[in-house]
Design a protein with these regions (language model features):
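Divalent metal-dependent phosphate-bond-processing catalytic cores, especially two-metal-ion Mg2+/Mn2+ enzymes
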Residues: 9-116
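His-Asp-centered metal-binding catalytic motifs of divalent-metal-dependent phosphohydrolases/nucleases
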Residues: 1-5
Length: 116
């Protein structure tokens, strides 16, 4: 249970629990994380990308009728993952994967908006 993302979950205490926590979180970052997030959005009937409302940007809550795209998931959850890790190795790997994910979604949004 200590490896769950939830804010009120148990915090990992042992080295093994911290390693498991970090490994679980690293799976949602980088190229694999982008692919998983997009696949999940599509399987859930949500768009790959839609611009988030101002309300979502400020509160993390969608406006009525606003889809929860993979970009929403990135903004709400994935970009914060690297700050929750415990091990030095996990943080090092996360920094690289987070940078890729950030670049990927910036590029995806720019192409979606016709800016690139």
């Amino acid at each position: 249970r200590a490896h769950r993302y939830r804010h009120n979950g148990e915090r990992p205490e042992t080295l093994e629990a911290k390693c498991l926590f970090d490994a679980d979180k690293l799976d949602v970052l980088g190229a694999v994380g982008a692919a998983r997030t997009i696949a999940y959005a599509v399987l859930a009937g949500q768009p790959v990308l839609s611009e988030p409302s101002q309300q979502f940007l400020e509160t993390g809550k969608n406006e009525p009728g606003e889809p929860h795209s993979s970009y929403h998931e990135y903004l709400f959850k994935l970009r914060k993952v690297k700050d929750k890790l415990f091990t030095k190795t996990g943080k090092t790997i996360a920094a690289d994967r987070d940078a890729f994910l950030s670049e990927f979604y910036e590029r995806l949004l720019a192409e979606y908006l016709g800016e690139r």
